[in-house]
């Protein structure tokens, strides 16, 4: 069985969480792991009308047979971690989650610095979660590791070993990235970026998967890309236009209103190329065409929506295998068997 990596193709908030949640329930992976930066990314999913938002634990938590892992490359905030354990107690997360003992720790001093530093919080528009300062300490070899926090001892493991053992046994491993290509420290709109690279290759390294062991890379795009905070946004639309179209969203972590733009085909093609996309997922198609809401059969999509998907495939050069048509888990078109 393969390893599958899911990453964002825009500026985050593409709906990676909903894609990971669907794959978790439909494909039943034995392991669901989180790579990426840390608690500055909030992934949300709607289950039976109830919205769950997580910043630390993998979004596939509702797959109660899966082992949930947080890779060594991810920053861990113990306060957020234990809050989510309590929040998700109905899903028996506590007995299934593991943290790599090498994860760096976000401390209160990191959060305070992130929130009070005029450059980070004011100009760059960081989330204030402490990830940037914590990663800076990690680079300087000053950060604490998960193995140094007594309260985390029951959850410590070697994530890389667990994942590679699972792959050796033919198990399916699903890996969830954070943020999006436009926020990559290397390839994004520097300096308005996050504190590390978040492309598929880095997400694989975060959890200990070597390049030759990556089987599939799914890059997620939202029909109307959004961005929180400062930074270039070439296809941004006026807020009045976003209001008129009903495209009003707020960040999961910051609560700040998201800036909205038109789909950027040039960026999407470059993002898919650098990430090595084998397949695309498109979310919120119902926002592009309201008549697409809740459709689960590709052949039943209205013409406007179908032409948009076909244009993405043609201009990006990668097939679209998953299409979200609404907020609920079942609001999805799965074309993977036909592309």
Swiss-Prot record:
Its main location: cytoplasm. Mg(2+) binds at residues 13, 42. GTP binds at residues 12-18, 42-44, 258, 284-286, 324-326. The keyword Cytoplasm applies. Belongs to the adenylosuccinate synthetase family. It is found in: Cytoplasm. NCBIfam families: PRK04293.1. One of its GO terms (molecular function) is adenylosuccinate synthase activity. One of its GO terms (cellular component) is cytoplasm. The active site is at residues 13, 43. This is Adenylosuccinate synthetase. SUPFAM superfamilies: P-loop containing nucleoside triphosphate hydrolases (SSF52540). Binds 1 Mg(2+) ion per subunit. Its cofactor is Mg(2+). It comes from the Archaea. It catalyses: IMP + L-aspartate + GTP = N(6)-(1,2-dicarboxyethyl)-AMP + GDP + phosphate + 2 H(+). One of its GO terms (biological process) is IMP metabolic process. Substrate binds at residues 252-258. Its EC number is 6.3.4.4. Plays an important role in the de novo pathway of purine nucleotide biosynthesis. Catalyzes the first committed step in the biosynthesis of AMP from IMP. HAMAP family: Adenylosucc_synth.
């Amino acid at each position: 069985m393969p390893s599958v990596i899911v990453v964002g193709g825009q500026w985050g908030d593409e709906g990676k969480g909903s894609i990971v949640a669907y794959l978790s329930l439909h494909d039943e992976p034995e392991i669901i792991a989180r790579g990426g930066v840390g608690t500055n990314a909030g992934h949300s999913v709607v289950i039976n009308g109830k919205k769950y938002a997580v910043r630390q634990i993998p979004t596939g938590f509702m797959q109660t047979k899966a082992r949930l892992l947080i890779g060594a490359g991810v920053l861990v905030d113990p306060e957020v971690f234990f809050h989510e354990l309590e929040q998700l107690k109905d899903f028996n997360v506590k007995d299934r989650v593991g943290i790599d003992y090498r994860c760096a720790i976000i401390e209160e001093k990191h959060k305070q610095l992130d929130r009070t530093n005029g450059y980070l919080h004011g100009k760059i528009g960081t989330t204030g979660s402490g990830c940037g300062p914590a990663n800076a300490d990690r680079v300087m070899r000053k950060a604490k590791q998960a193995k140094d926090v007594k309260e985390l001892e029951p959850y410590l493991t070697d994530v890389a070993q667990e994942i590679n053992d699972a792959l050796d046994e033919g198990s399916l491993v699903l890996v969830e990235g954070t943020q999006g290509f436009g926020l990559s420290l290397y390839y994004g709109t520097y300096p308005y970026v996050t504190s590390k690279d978040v492309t598929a290759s880095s997400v694989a390294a975060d959890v200990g998967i070597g390049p030759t062991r990556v089987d599939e890379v799914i890059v997620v795009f939202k029909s109307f890309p959004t961005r929180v905070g400062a930074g270039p946004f070439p296809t941004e639309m006026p807020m009045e236009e976003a209001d008129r179209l009903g495209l009003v969203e707020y960040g999961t972590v910051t609560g700040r209103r998201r800036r909205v733009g038109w789909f950027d085909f040039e960026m999407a093609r470059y993002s898919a190329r650098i990430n090595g996309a084998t397949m695309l997922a498109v979310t919120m198609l119902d926002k592009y065409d309201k008549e697409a809401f809740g459709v689960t059969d590709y052949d039943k999509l209205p013409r406007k929506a179908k032409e948009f998907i076909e244009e993405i495939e043609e201009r990006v050069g990668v097939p679209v295998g998953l299409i979200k048509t609404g907020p609920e888990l079942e609001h999805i078109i799965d074309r993977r068997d036909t592309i």
